[in-house]
Amino acid sequence: MNFLMSEEQSAIVDMASRLFADFCTDETIQQFWAGDEPYDRALWQALREGGLTALILPEDLGGSALGMTELCAVLESQGRRLAPAPLWPHQLAVAALAKFAEGAPGMAELADATRLATLSLEGLQQSRGLTLHARKTDAGWRLNGRAVAVPQAEQAALAVLPAQTAEGVRLFAVDPAQAGVERIGGRLTHHEPAADLVINDLELPTAAALGEQALDWLGPRVAACLGALQLGVSGEALKRAVAYTSERVQFGQPIAAFQAISQKTADCLIDVEALRSSLWQLVWRLDAGLDAAGAAGVVRAWTCDTGHRVTHAAQHMHGGVGVDVSYPIHRYTYWSRALEIACGGVTANLEALGRWLATPALTDADC
């Protein structure tokens, strides 16, 4: 079995890696964190011109109609450089609208990434319930409640939000700037802008509700994107820790030669490779059109666990340098924690995975 990327896939990853390397040095990322920009606009323009903002979008919208394999390979490169660009929430939101929404407004501009789309992770996490509710009306739907920490919500022209209905959770396309929506902005742990959307008696047409299968389609893909970013973040944090401990001399030898350090880095490598294996299993299942609920649960758990252990260890191995915020390693810890929180936490995900494993109808084909 050939696990290597195709020529086309390798070319996409190479282009993305070059762009992230050019725009996202340690110095430029430090400057970005010191500023107020929501994302790197020059990088976003370069990603648009390279077609990387439309990898999974259908061809009739100007996309490449590629799969999660290509997107996640690019996201791993993004994670390594901590690139400040809303690459995955924009693409998944637009792809979901294209697949499950009837005539969503402004799709051409969204597909071209001249206007941003985003999505809420509530309802896709395993750790808490929804605070946004939707009730059917004669004219369509009425929404009330709050969508918490929606990424880029103050910049987005359209947001895909999950809301609790009488029949279950449903996704809705909402313009965050319209009347009836209040945006309360802030920054997440890794400096990404986000906003709570407080919604009061927002009337939406029937077409604003995405198809009933949209949530099941979106959830595993969100897990894959978060896992790919975590793979890049954790892998690069480990790489930097290995480089530092190989150069840092104490008691006449590099500290990497000490048993405690070598064993800790070996444990970290096992964690990173476990995440890598589970991620590509999930991505393969998604692109093959197979059920991916169980694989997504495994990836969410590893995304939380791997990131927490690896970046904590990498920070620790840097010693006093690791707590100096002029040195870049702390930003990997912040990114890793943000991704862990976005996934809902390891405990909640392991509990959800246990419930899935206990499902009586589970067969070998589902694993």
Residue locations for each model-derived region?
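A short core secondary-structure module
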Residues: 144-181
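Short glycine/proline-enriched turns and hinge-like loops at secondary-structure junctions
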Residues: 66, 128, 152-156
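N-terminal glycine-rich flavin-associated loop
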Residues: 84-103
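Flexible, small-/acidic-enriched active-site or ligand-binding loops
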Residues: 149-150, 175-206, 213-214
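Generic beta-strand structural signal
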Residues: 134-137, 164
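A short, Trp-centered hydrophobic/proline-enriched beta-strand micro-motif
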Residues: 112-124
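Alpha-helical interface subdomain recognition
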Residues: 1-81, 136, 140-141, 220-367
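Active-site-adjacent elements of ketosynthase-type condensing enzymes
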Residues: 125-132
